[in-house]
Amino acid sequence: MDHLHSSTETTTALPELQWLEAPLMTTQEDVLFPLAWEELACRQVGKGAAPILHVWRHPAALVIGHRDRRLPNAPQAMERVRSSGTSVCVRPSGGAAVMLDRGVLNLSLILPNPQRAISLHEDFRLMAGLIADALAPWSAEAQTGEIIGSFCPGDYDVSVRGRKFCGIAQRRQAKAYIITAFVMIEGHGAERAQAVQQFYREAAGDTPAGVQQPDYPRVNPATMGSLAELAGVPSVEAYTASLRRVVESRAAILPADGSLVQLEGLAEQMAALRERYDLQV
């Protein structure tokens, strides 16, 4: 487990960028929408548009990974979640299932990659450093390292006292890429973990004796926590304001380009993502 130091100490520089903070989505909106938007925005960054930090939230969504979708009963489990009024999608980036609500902040750093040379560890450290720096007004205890039993586990889980509040993943395109993170700020981490745990139980189904069980994260709800629980962060708004100050101290914030992604292309992109990652399994 590594203590996090300031993101200014990483070798990956934070460029001048656009801060794009979307309003809280509604329960009727498809959680695939912001992911499709990021796919199109990433292409524009690859063509020379300014880098972006995309900040968004959805009030009730389950976002699963490619491997999750391949579990034997995944379609039925996804439909059960949808029937409860929760939006469900398979995301194009790496990682496993994540439960989203209004207390979870989603961050996506969209950066150019003209030389097609990505340092995965440096970029993950950059995002983890920003997240830890934004937590500094309340706690200096953020650490990175996989939290066994967490949902969406990875080497760059960000935790406080052994309980994970943030996971980081990446999505690559030809000339740009996206570093994504979820940050649990309000609410209870264990409740979100229980919902993910239930999804996996249903998606994996019953395994007959003598048959190897499907491979999926075994979630222990006690390993997850929100920043309200772990560090006394009062609200998503307070943490987001702190993150904005951290970013402003590292980079020039450019005016947001509202015409970067054309709305008419989003429906087509959403359909393409659904076809590739959900239907063709």
Regions found by a protein language model. Give the residues of each.
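N-terminal lobe of the biotin/lipoate ligase/transferase fold
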Residues: M1-I118
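Beta-rich nucleic-acid/ligand-interaction surfaces
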Residues: T144-K164
